[in-house]
Amino acid sequence: MAGILADDSRPAEHVVADLAMGGQALGKFANRLPALVPPWNRIAPHLVRFLPEIGIRGLSTIGARTREVPIRGLRQNNVHIDVIDWRGKRTGTARGFLGSDFIINEVVSHLHARRTGGADAGEATGLMTHHADMDDAMFEFVTELVNRTRAHPAVVWQRASEVFSCS
């Protein structure tokens, strides 16, 4: 399937056909979740309206969502924090780990914004991971974050089917 970027200049029907074909291929697997995480977590806004027509019920991009349900039949929940410094602007190393302190501060900032009206309180705080690009330190951080927060009574880790109401 060709990349579907925010600046994809192909006709919408070609992009939607690629998405539908990909969805059909994924449909051959058990427990398929009808949700889309587009390449680089970006999709051209004019394509979103076609997603429910091809069976996609959930969408995740990067940054704050504008609406929980951008179009009838589609629920959106985005990621807000990336573990990788892709261009090396913060760490000095392209594709480097942003570090535990930085990521925890970002998580706390997003949670604070949710509680004080600065972010959509109904949108789960999303952490973006990249299994193919992560090193041991990144995997260890994510594992420790999940394990430590899972034990806290105020934390609820949700399944993707819950986040996108596809259960």
PLM regions: where:
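Alpha-helical structural signal in soluble globular domains
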Residues: A25, F29, F50-I54, E144-H152
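Metal-dependent polysaccharide deacetylase catalytic core of the NodB/CE4 family, i.e.
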Residues: M1-R49, E68-P70, I81-R90, L127
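Residue-level preference for long, well-ordered alpha-helices that form the structural scaffold
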Residues: I4, P11, V15, G96-I103, ...
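Active-site-adjacent pocket scaffolds in enzyme catalytic domains
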Residues: P38-G118
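A generic secondary-structure signal
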Residues: M21-K28, S109-G117, R148
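Well-ordered, non-membrane alpha-helical segments in soluble/globular domains
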Residues: D18-L19, S100-H110, F139-L145
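C-terminal domain-boundary segment and adjacent tail
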Residues: G58-L59, G117-S167
